[in-house]
Amino acid sequence: MPLTWHRPESPSLASYSNCWRLSPGAELVQDRLAHKLDVARGTVVRYFDLLESLFLIHRLPAGSRNLTKRQIQRPKVFLIDTGLNAALSNMDAAHLSSMQGADHLGPLLEQFVVCELLRHQEWSATPFKLFHYRDRQGAEVDIIVETPAGIIAVEVTSTAAATARHFQHLKALRDRLGDEFLAGIVLTTSTGQKAGDRLESLPVSSLWSR
């Protein structure tokens, strides 16, 4: 009887993208993902390179040249199309506006803001780079916009108004960077207001209405 050999099935590209479908903006830990999918780490690297070349995902790098060396260096991963992400996850407007959907709305809104800023890079008169920030003491900022003149730090919240908690890490970054810190902005789902020296909240709609 002839021996037969069955090649083990490799996870599909969908398996990789699905890892960020329900948790957009999660940090990429390649070893952990390789273990979860039962593949070699090199396979994870190749698949993510392919997903990125197909413009299905974006890896938001950690840190910036102006920040501390205490920061964690893992990138965050976002699916490029927020609407597709919501549709594949069966999350409609009714769900996202409900109490049960509150935990999903925040990450989706952060994903949307990152994708909008990526589009802005194509036509902005001021060149800028995008990063995220998290250090070993737990300080975290959703998005760092690095311009030639300095840094703009951005937090994203699905709440209608920003509170002192939303500005906590922005203030710490402002005090650490001094004049290099241009602004700290909390993007909300409603109106904005001033919140101190170089700090303010703005509606998400300001990304395309200003």
Model-assigned labels for residue ranges:
Residues L130, A183-G184:
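Hydrophobic/aromatic residues located in beta-strands of well-ordered beta-sheets
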Residues A149-G150, D179-A183:
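Short glycine-/polar-rich loops that comprise or flank the Walker A/P-loop
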Residues M1-I151:
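Accessory nucleic acid-recognition modules appended to NTPase machines
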Residues A86-A87, T163-A164, Q193-D197:
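Switch/connector loops and helix/strand junctions flanking conserved nucleotide-binding motifs
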Residues V156-A164:
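Short beta-strand-loop-alpha-helix junction that forms the active-site gateway
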Residues E122-W123, A172-E180:
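Arginine/glycine-rich "motif VI" loop of SF2 helicases in the C-terminal RecA-like domain
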Residues T189-R210:
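Domain-level recognition of nuclease-like catalytic cores that cleave nucleotide substrates
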Residues R134, T157, L187-T188:
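Short beta-strand/turn micro-motifs composed of small residues
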